[in-house]
């Protein structure tokens, strides 16, 4: 894996999320491309809201001129991005994307191996819950796998594969494995939470056989009950694990999760979440 994108609102850079991004780049000896979304043409946020966002990111701006405010924040955040990358021994590349944010991100993802984004990234004039509409659209339309960044990063303990026997959940497992061969020594947990429609014994055997060709330490956990609540109970304590989930479609989560299951997971867990779709 050579091209990793870090997507951010140019006005507000989540510096803490860069720790995980730099960890990945160090692991794979990759450069990190910072995608700074300037949203110059259809800015819906008033100056007051932009100033609040900038302040949350550590920048105190005095001007009420939207263009001047954006330019100052973009310049300061690009410098911060470069400083953090240099501190971590990572080569940081900057793209200033000045068009429509969603369109810019999708085009960038077409020519990348992996995209990293914070679940709170938003260009709406209204306060939004997590994940925001912008992030949900990115998950649905991105043309490479996406990782929802953790709030903070203190190291990687285990990989958690969510599995229900469907092709999309297996596709996500395979995509993660192909992108992260350096993690073959990391313990893998295959988690299945089902209230019905269990994977067949033959399917589970084939998955085990495939996983043993790629990983050295594998655990299997099967639980009964309500998928949404049981899944959250199982994932929340895993503070140093990365969670791998299947396809995120615009109308449905076509693996273990439907939209009512996916949203609570992305809202509540603080771990990195890897999402891939066909």
Q: Where are the regions a protein language model picked out?
A:
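Conserved beta-strand termini and adjacent loop/short-helix elements that scaffold enzyme active sites
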Residues: 35-37, 95-99, 149, 191-193, ...
């Amino acid at each position: 894996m050579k091209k990793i994108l870090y997507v951010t609102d140019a006005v507000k850079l989540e510096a803490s999320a860069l720790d995980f991004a730099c960890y990945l780049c160090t692991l794979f000896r990759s450069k990190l491309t910072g995608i700074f979304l300037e949203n110059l043409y259809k800015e819906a946020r008033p100056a007051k809201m932009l100033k609040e966002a900038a302040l949350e990111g550590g920048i105190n701006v005095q001007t009420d001129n939207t263009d001047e405010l954006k330019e100052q924040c973009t310049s300061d955040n690009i410098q911060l991005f470069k400083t953090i990358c240099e501190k971590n021994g990572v080569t940081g590349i900057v793209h200033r994307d000045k068009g429509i944010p969603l369109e810019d991100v999708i085009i960038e993802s077409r020519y990348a191996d992996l995209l990293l984004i914070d679940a709170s990234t938003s260009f709406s004039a209204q306060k939004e819950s997590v994940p925001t509409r912008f992030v949900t659209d990115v998950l649905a339309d991105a043309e490479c796998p996406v990782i929802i960044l953790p709030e903070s990063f203190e190291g990687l303990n285990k990989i958690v594969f969510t599995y229900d026997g469907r092709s999309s959940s297996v596709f996500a497992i395979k995509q993660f494995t192909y992108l992260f061969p350096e993690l073959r020594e990391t313990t893998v947990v295959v988690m299945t939470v089902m209230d019905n429609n269990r994977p067949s014994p033959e399917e589970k055997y084939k998955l085990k056989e495939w996983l043993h060709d790629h990983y050295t330490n594998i655990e299997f956990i099967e639980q009964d009950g309500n998928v949404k609540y049981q899944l959250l109970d199982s994932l929340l304590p895993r503070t140093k694990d990365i969670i791998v989930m299947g396809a995120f479609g615009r109308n449905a989560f076509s693996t273990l999760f439907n939209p009512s299951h996916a949203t609570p997971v992305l809202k509540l867990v603080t771990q990195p979440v890897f999402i891939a779709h066909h």
